[in-house]
Regions:
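Active-site-adjacent structural elements in enzyme catalytic cores
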Residues: 1-116
Length: 116
């Protein structure tokens, strides 16, 4: 989800933009790590820009070997497609990238949704 940035959100999280991207992971291990942190977690994508998103720890290692300290292996992804990106700063909201959440699901939840 792309949302309007609130003043409390640091520049480092938004690259100085007036918007912020927020992801809501479904994976139980990821959610447990975020809950254990006790604060919102800011993190980059799990892939090098321009490369496909990894769907397993092996995929992650292939792309990130030597660039990161560790990988938490929670098993393979169940969806296997890119995350849906929806811009909620616009009226009506605009679907920028389809993914695991379908346009139909978004329209069921939000009503009118434009498509980029």
């Amino acid at each position: 989800m792309i949302l309007r940035r609130k003043p409390i959100v640091p520049d480092a999280v938004t690259a100085g933009l007036d918007t912020v991207g927020m992801r809501c992971p479904a994976h139980e291990v990821t959610r447990a790590i975020i809950a254990a942190a006790g604060v919102p977690v800011a993190a980059p994508s799990g892939n090098t820009s321009g490369r496909p998103s990894p769907t397993s720890a092996a995929d992650m290692l292939e792309d990130m070997d030597g660039k990161i300290d560790c990988i938490v292996d929670g098993g393979p992804c169940t969806v296997g497609v890119e995350s849906t990106i929806i811009d909620l700063t616009l009226t009506p909201p605009r679907l920028l990238r389809p993914g695991g959440v379908t346009l139909e699901q978004l329209r069921d939840a939000l009503g009118e949704v434009d498509v980029d």
